[in-house]
Amino acid sequence: MKSLYFVAGLLVMLAQGSWQHSLQNTEEKSSSFPAPQTDPLGDPDQISEDKRHSQGTFTSDYSKYLDSRRAQDFVQWLMNTKRNKNNIAKRHDEFERHAEGTFTSDVSSYLEGQAAKEFIAWLVKGRGRRDFPEEVNIVEELRRRHADGSFSDEMNTVLDSLATRDFINWLLQTKI
């Protein structure tokens, strides 16, 4: 896109220069006063000075155009930088997240290794097999529950007895 603007600006400047040059030629031809013989219009030095002047004007205009383009590009860069909130900080955040993820991954690997060691120790200890030497152990193993907030076996027994008593009272009070 920048090259398109550059080419368009160059064409505009060339067209403007040729338009100004043609106007100057028209004005010189239409002058009502003939040039005296001592006037150096036909002199090659005068032609080269005019040529250098027009080249200098073109170069000056072109330099001004390039300066304005650089200024526009710089402003655009500043706006993009502000929108992106400084790319260096973004890279730093990504690096920190990567480091934190690596740390988390290392901790997870360590904990998995520890869990595997504990499981192997549990299997070696004999907890993996169910040896029921006494019936007390069977009842105790079957009644054991998670610590997830569920009622214990005793609480269920109490609730069952309360429900049974309420049901019997209801039967006695209702006439069938």
Curated annotation (Swiss-Prot):
> Segment Disordered: which positions?
25-59
Summary of the tissues where the protein is detected = Glucagon is secreted in the A cells of the islets of Langerhans. GLP-1, GLP-2, oxyntomodulin and glicentin are secreted from enteroendocrine cells throughout the gastrointestinal tract. GLP-1 and GLP-2 are also secreted in selected neurons in the brain.
A GO cellular component entry from the record: extracellular space
What does the record note about the induction of this protein?
Glucagon release is stimulated by hypoglycemia and inhibited by hyperglycemia, insulin, and somatostatin. GLP-1 and GLP-2 are induced in response to nutrient ingestion.
Please list the residues that carry the modification Arginine amide.
127
Supply the SMART domains for this chain: GLUCA (SM00070)
Site positions per UniProt: Cleavage: 52-53, 83-84, 91-92, 97-98, 130-131, 145-146
The GO terms this record gives for MF are: glucagon receptor binding; hormone activity
Removed propeptide positions:
84-89, 131-145
- First and last residue of the signal peptide: 1-20
Q: Which key words are in the record?
A: Amidation, Cleavage on pair of basic residues, Hormone, Phosphoprotein, Secreted, Signal
Location comes to:
Secreted
The record's listing under Pfam families reads:
Hormone_2
Question: What GO terms in the biological process aspect are recorded for it?
Answer: adenylate cyclase-modulating G protein-coupled receptor signaling pathway; glucose homeostasis; negative regulation of apoptotic process; positive regulation of insulin secretion involved in cellular response to glucose stimulus; protein kinase A signaling; regulation of insulin secretion; response to activity
Q: Please give the family membership noted in the entry.
A: Belongs to the glucagon family.
Report what the protein is called.
Answer: Pro-glucagon
Whichever gene encodes this chain, its name is GCG
